[in-house]
């Protein structure tokens, strides 16, 4: 089976590419290359790659493709607020355009990496479910993901299976690591500085999931019967996969023996708190999605990865692992223009 994977040179994509190839899939990666050189360790390189903006994909790029896993886009709320219009152009309109092109060219399945951010600020007394919970997207990133989901689902039919997966905040090692996401940030802070400072009171809730379990979810969208996954959305997480920031910080501290954990409480309670229900993916896709990673295993993996790669505070706080810093660096150095188009092949 030939898989076109957009965002193959990103945080999740670098891991997913390796897993797909190990499983015998033929992978074509499509990525604009903004983060291609932001590497720790050795990402897999021996596969077919196109360096191209997803806004520019054309029919010949899809020749012989059976399924698309669409990860590419501006990857979180801070990046989304960099330019709300561009966020909509890329994450919403670019996604819908690609899905339409896929359907026109006989692609059988379209798997979309969506987001739980579309739920917005919510009450924590009830876990958020895929269909019944209100969608209240606040940021440009969240709005774009929600708008794209609705549009591409309208394209689904018996011959074009559309599935949307909404991952929890991801953690875990990757050759293109991100440290602008909560658990990776906490473990990296403990490892490089010897301490973790939490400015809130630690009570906000955050669902998190390991990058390899997220990859497993996307692959389940390739192999599960269309009757289960077509025109449907799935929250991606693990059993009991909602944690307070205090839980996450304690797990990070435990991953780095000797590190110090301090709750300053100076910002009080964070309004960004939510809990998510994972019953659908854990029951309906249980034959295909079998999460294997918890916080302590993931924390141990991160520390081992840091030791193997010579990870330091310069990586943790710099553009190697902070996506918005890299994007600003590319613009400041005239590598890309203000529409996030490449000015030079030397990225």
Predicted regions and their residues:
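C-terminal substrate-binding subdomain of Rossmann-fold SDR/epimerase-dehydratase oxidoreductases
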Residues: 194, 199-347
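NAD(P)H-binding glycine-rich loop region in Rossmannoid oxidoreductase-like domains
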Residues: 54-90, 101
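Conserved glycine-rich Rossmann-like NAD(P)H-binding loop of the short-chain dehydrogenase/reductase
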Residues: 25-34
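N-terminal Rossmann NAD(P)H-binding glycine-rich loop of SDR-like oxidoreductase domains
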Residues: 3-23
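NAD(P)-dependent short-chain dehydrogenase/reductase
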Residues: 150-206, 211-220, 250-255
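Catalytic helix-loop patch of NAD(P)-dependent Rossmann-fold dehydrogenases
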Residues: 82-85, 89-100, 109, 118, ...
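SDR active-site strand-loop-helix element
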Residues: 6, 30, 68-71, 110-116, ...
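Rossmann-fold cofactor-recognition segment
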Residues: 43-56
């Amino acid at each position: 089976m030939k898989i076109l994977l957009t965002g193959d040179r990103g945080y999740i994509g670098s891991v997913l590419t390796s897993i797909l190839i190990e499983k015998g899939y033929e992978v074509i990666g499509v990525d604009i290359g903004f983060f291609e050189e932001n590497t720790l360790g050795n990402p897999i390189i021996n596969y077919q790659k196109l360096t191209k903006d997803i806004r520019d994909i054309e029919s010949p790029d899809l020749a012989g493709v059976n399924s698309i896993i669409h990860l590419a886009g501006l990857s979180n709320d801070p990046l989304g607020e960099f330019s709300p219009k561009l966020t909509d152009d890329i994450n919403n309109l670019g996604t819908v355009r690609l899905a339409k092109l896929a359907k026109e060219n006989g692609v059988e399945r379209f798997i979309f990496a969506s987001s739980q951010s579309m739920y917005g600020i919510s009450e924590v007394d009830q876990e958020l479910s895929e269909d019944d919970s209100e969608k209240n997207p606040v940021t440009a990133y969240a709005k774009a993901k929600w708008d794209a989901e609705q549009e591409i689902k309208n394209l689904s039919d018996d011959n074009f299976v559309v599935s949307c997966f909404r991952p929890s905040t991801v953690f875990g090692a990757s050759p293109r690591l991100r440290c602008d996401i909560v658990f990776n940030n906490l473990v990296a802070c403990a490892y490089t500085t010897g301490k973790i400072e939490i400015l809130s009171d630690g009570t906000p809730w955050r669902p998190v999931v390991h990058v390899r379990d997220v990859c497993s979810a996307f692959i389940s969208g390739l192999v599960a019967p269309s009757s289960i996954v077509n025109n449907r959305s799935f929250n991606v997480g693990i059993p009991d996969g909602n944690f307070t920031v205090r839980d996450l910080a304690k797990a990070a501290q435990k991953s780095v023996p000797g590190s110090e954990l301090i709750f300053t409480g100076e910002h009080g309670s964070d309004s960004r708190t939510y809990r998510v229900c994972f019953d659908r993916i854990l029951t309906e896709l249980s034959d295909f999605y079998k999460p294997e990673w918890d916080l302590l295993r993931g924390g141990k993996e991160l520390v081992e990865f840091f030791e193997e790669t010579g990870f330091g505070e310069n990586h943790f706080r710099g553009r190697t692992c902070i996506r918005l810093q890299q994007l600003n660096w590319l613009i400041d150095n005239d590598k890309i223009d203000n529409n996030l188009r490449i000015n030079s092949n030397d990225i």
